[in-house]
């Protein structure tokens, strides 16, 4: 009896009431791209406690030398920090146009210089392809799922989700 009740509730929630898709039908795609990026980062980063995850706090914000955090952040403070960090990264990748948000989300996780290159790291193949105007970047984006040379399934899932939510062909 309980199973039947649960099934009918689920069926009622999935039954459309008119011809246009509802907010529930669209899910995360109903949000603007920046909001999708924020929600994706929050989901995959998880909450960082200052005592256990120093120098990271909130949803993966790296504490900078001039920042003084003595206790945990509120969710609102962490949300503000995340949005600020992501906005700065979007500005850093602005010249890449429609790929700037996708690159910013990747840089939030791996660091901008693994993508842009510097003295320690060469410019990524992903960025080289984007600069040449090539759009087959999925494989190169998914290559950022390695840690110590091994492909990590959870990171690969994150990259695949990023692509589904933010990649514009």
Where are these regions (language model features)?
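Short, glycine/acidic-enriched capping/hinge loops at junctions between secondary-structure elements
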Residues: 52-54, 67-70
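Early exported N-terminus immediately downstream of N-terminal targeting peptides
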Residues: 53-57, 61
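Surface-exposed patches in mature extracellular/periplasmic domains of secreted proteins
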Residues: 48-53, 92-102, 140
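Long, amphipathic alpha-helical surface segments
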Residues: 12-48, 61-66, 73-89, 114-169
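Short N-proximal segments of mature Sec-exported proteins
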Residues: 100-114
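Classical Sec-dependent N-terminal signal peptides that target proteins to the secretory pathway
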Residues: 1-12
